[in-house]
Amino acid sequence: MTTNLTRSEAQSRTQLLEVDSYSVHIDVSNAETDADTYLSRTVVDFSARFVDSTFIDLIADSVSSVLINGESLSPAEVFDGARVTFPVRAGRNSLTIEAQARYSTSGEGLHRFTDPADGKTYLYTQYEPTDARRVFANFDQPDLKAEFIFTVTAPAHFQVLSNRTEARTEPADGSAGAVTHYFEPTLKQSSYITCITAGPYEGATDEWTDPRTGQTVQLGAWTRASLVDHLDADDIFGVTKAGLEFFTSEFDYPYPWGKYDQIFVPEYNLGAMENPGLVTFTDNLIFRDKVTDANYESRANVILHEMAHMWFGDLVTMKWWDDLWLKESFADFMGGLALAEATRFTDGWVTFALRRKAWAYTQDLYPTTHPIVADIPDVEAAKLNFDGITYAKGASVLKQLVAFVGREAFFAGSRLYFKRFEYGNTELADFLECLAEAAPDRDIANWASAWLGTSGVSELSLQLTTSDGSAEASEGSSAVSGGSIGFANGGASASAVSAQSGGRGKLVTSSSGARLRGPDAVDDNFDAATGAAHEAGSGASGSVEPPRRRSGSEKITSATIAQADSAEGTALLRPHTIEIATLGRSGRSIVPLDSFRFEFSTESADVEQLIGRSAGVITLLNFNDLDYARVRLDPESTEAAVTSASRIKDPLSRALVWSALDNAVRDGLMPVQKYLTAYARSLGKESHAGIMAGLSQTALTCIDQWVADRNFDAAIMGLLGAALDALAAAKAGSDAQLHLANLVLALTSRTARCAAGSSAVAMGRGFASQVLAVPVGEEIDRMYAGAPGQSGQAGSAGQSAETSGGTRASRGADHSTATLPFRGLINDHALRWNALTALVSLGWADQTDIARENHSDPSSSGRLRAETASAALPLPIVKIRAWEAIREAGALSNDVLSAIIAGFIAPSAMPLIEEYVDEYFDGLLGFWMDNSIEIARRLVLGLYPRWSVDEEAVVEKTDAWLAANVDAPAALRRLVIERRDDLARAIFLKSTQSSRH
């Protein structure tokens, strides 16, 4: 069976065929039974340019009949499990295939889900890149567009939707209680964006009328019956209408697909999918529990991203997955633009600058990095290229392109592109040609070569001299505490680094063989709550001068900007259009004093516009975030940022400064403890929900991966103390209060790694106990003491008191954190599960507690949280059973598998899963070969043993596996290489830390 369609095979079919239409009948009348398969019947009419033989894609349990031009072929002879081979004649042809396709539990193909809340069954399809073949026979490649006519037979009480409106329904022949739904033909489109949903979905309808054309678009928003009370249709429709008005106006092209249904479905592998007329979303975007404004912003962004695809991707589609960026980069950029300009989220680019671009930077520093326009030889490679480069880097580079050619020229080129290639397929050259016509005064070809055809991220730095004669270099050329750290592949890319055994100042080896050293002694003796830190460098004496800060009165006497490329390891030069700003004090705030636009394409350039201006306290490159580049702050700007980032008034500038600090700590240019100190200072001061979420993500990565074991207790205790203090002082009912509560619980779950008797454990356990003592819907404003089992023994052995939430809170020894009221903090299921899972990891709650909580929350999310908590129990037998379940991944749904993996690898006080390191590497090929690519990806990534107590041994085992499996699928090797890179980075960053003294 050959499931991996190659580019060359697709090109051969394109040269041979032109597809006219598909008539597809799907019979899911048995969906609510134990049946594993359903009937799929396809009639495809097409033309062939010459006599030949070819194949159509189909992954099915069995094929019962194959007819080509009326001639019957033997299924046993022509079907191999993934392809049906047949002869074609020159001219018109008709192929009919009838098969039994399998209901999916992996989120690929036709996924079936039974809601544990009410027992109702739901179906939906998900195809990109090539899973339409799991549902019906088709030529599953983007450039063989056709008209699709769907008919679906389903139980009578099912709501059935597809890309087009329903034409009529009829009672089904031979299926009692079933109805057949006939849908209007689609417009010409690719197979991967066809869609069917069926089930007792509920929702709301609305409509939008285009003020320019008078066109009325029918709107729908749908979800499961158990979630419909939380649908928030008014908000969803509000964003939808704003987006339709924005895009139809900016693109000067009416919405082309008729209706606009949006359906939120369970166990979805993606955020959403741009099926024209029927956009599918994960129902994680339906908020049952309270969330911060960052979640509402994220949902709006996803809605607008998918809507942008109606033009970029659906109307005009890439020929092959090499040009995936022609839809994903554009949708990411356009979604962000519409978010900021057409909705209430006017600062939507803030979250993009800090969080979305961090994804791009990380991906771009892996040894597996690739150009935005990538080489995609097959569909397995395509599946993995839905990554931070194709999405976030591509979107950021498009922001740079808009800055380079101007907004009007960019949109003029886009409008020309839609009109010239509507309902067709394109490649890079087609868009560039349209853009060049719209911007004749710009060298589009050179820009595209520099930005789209190269990999890696530029690093921008600024060398300043101020009026007092001091020279200030960016971090990239200065010492962290006096000693320069160099890394291959930019900063600390561990593509790079293969940690050798040894103590502090370990030797690491780059991919080129260069030997690199980190600081011999960077002291982790710090208190994150107070911000006190002591640092020592790698100089001969280990002493350094204290960091110097600008007063704000200095004048700049010289300024030079420089660029270098991290991934290439050379001075790869790109044209940059950026803004530069100086930030200074205004009362207690830090605000822009001056800013200007600057263009350069050389390795370095003098910035004469800065001379004579105030240096302020922070000099910020890439002000307003027009560029895709990692900014290196000069040392004095860094010191100001570490102590005062929260005082920067403009949230976008604040996000950009934090982004620079994030990159510095990741690259080993800033001590981990210094970053955590800066982060601790921000707690309680930061009010932007997107920034809070981005900073906590980096801080938790520091705790999970980059803090040395010997410093772990001090680091987490400092952060927990700071977070609890900030939570106690937070405004009642605010985003900050909710974020801090979840942060405290996230940190608490990690205290399982702390030494016995650590006060950090007691601090976190006290708050978790407080959460579990309060029922859902009530305010956590009372004073409690103790935690489950705190009286001396874990779990049921503790003295307990029942609560209406279903989990007992045992009365035990008092401690300070258990007496804090958190007024305005309303308890919900999410908080309770976070608290319970933390206590489970600590051994202070057991299976009885989990069962009771699940009984009080029988929803699908409750079931998943119970699976995670159960697998997190720190008992050897639990880990054995979890591993056995994981190894039988085919019997689990995608989300249940991930939930069990999350619990299996949860922190615990004992190294309970060390024995599975070797089993992981022994099973890697089986993970990949025996499962669909989505399930395989979850296994390979989720189980990679970075949790091992012997990280260096894991790197060695990874290298041995890669050396022994050079012929393993490239997509599998890529995942393993990237996980190795993360682990090698962690080893390096830990090696730069000394023990406390």
Sequence positions of predicted segments:
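Cation-handling catalytic/transport regions enriched in His/Asp/Glu
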Residues: 263-265, 269-271, 290-295, 320-324, ...
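Surface-exposed patches in mature extracellular/periplasmic domains of secreted proteins
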Residues: 254-262, 321-322, 346-349, 413, ...
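Acidic/His-enriched low-complexity segments
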Residues: 1-258, 289, 361-362, 375, ...
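Alpha-helical scaffold elements that line and support the substrate/ligand-binding pocket
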Residues: 306-317, 331-335, 393-414
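Non-catalytic accessory/interaction domains
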Residues: 154, 308, 375, 397, ...
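Juxtacatalytic substrate-recognition/specificity segment
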Residues: 150, 179, 202-310, 314-324, ...
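Acidic/His/Gly-enriched intrinsically disordered linker/tail segments
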Residues: 272, 328, 332-400, 404, ...
